[in-house]
Design a protein with these regions (language model features):
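A short, N-terminal "cap"/entry segment at the start of jelly-roll beta-barrel domains
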Residues: 1-37
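Short, charged low-complexity linear motifs
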Residues: 4-5, 38, 74, 83-84
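Short, flexible coil/turn micro-motifs enriched in small/turn-prone residues
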Residues: 9, 16, 42, 61-63, ...
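Intrinsically disordered, low-complexity regions enriched in Ser/Pro/Gly/Gln/His and often acidic
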Residues: 11-12, 45, 80-81
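Conserved short histidine dyad/triad with adjacent acidic residue
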Residues: 24-27, 38-55
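Generic structural detector for well-ordered beta-strands
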Residues: 27-29, 43, 71, 79
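Short, charged/polar surface micro-motifs in flexible loops or helix N-caps
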Residues: 33-35, 44-47, 67-69
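A short beta-strand-loop-beta hairpin characteristic of the jelly-roll/cupin
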Residues: 49, 54-82, 89-92
Length: 93
């Protein structure tokens, strides 16, 4: 068993090649073999957004506070709110 205590890992600013605006990334856990899952709490200041990108194994977003928008490239912009879970399949922008 491995317990990661809140605040035990350093926060970082989201890199400008990944994000527009001010974004804070708080790592929660990294994948330990044989697992492939990692998690982070990502906080977006108003107006901040993610650059178009893909994840080879897909990505799950869990909205914990605030509201925002999610969109697949070329798709409809969807409003997301606390409690919503968004799944992006592998390779989808």
């Amino acid at each position: 068993m491995d317990i990661k205590r809140i605040g035990s890992q350093p926060s970082g600013r989201g890199p400008p090649d990944w994000f527009t605006g001010t974004v804070r990334i708080d790592p929660l856990f990294k994948a330990s073999d044989p697992a492939r899952v990692a998690g982070a709490s990502v906080t977006f200041e108003p107006g901040a957004r993610t650059a178009w990108h893909t994840h080879p194994l897909g990505q799950t977003l869990i909205v914990t506070a605030g509201c925002g928008w999610a969109q697949r490239q070329g798709g409809t912009i969807e409003e997301i709110k606390p409690g919503d879970v968004v799944w992006f399949p592998p390779g989808e922008k």
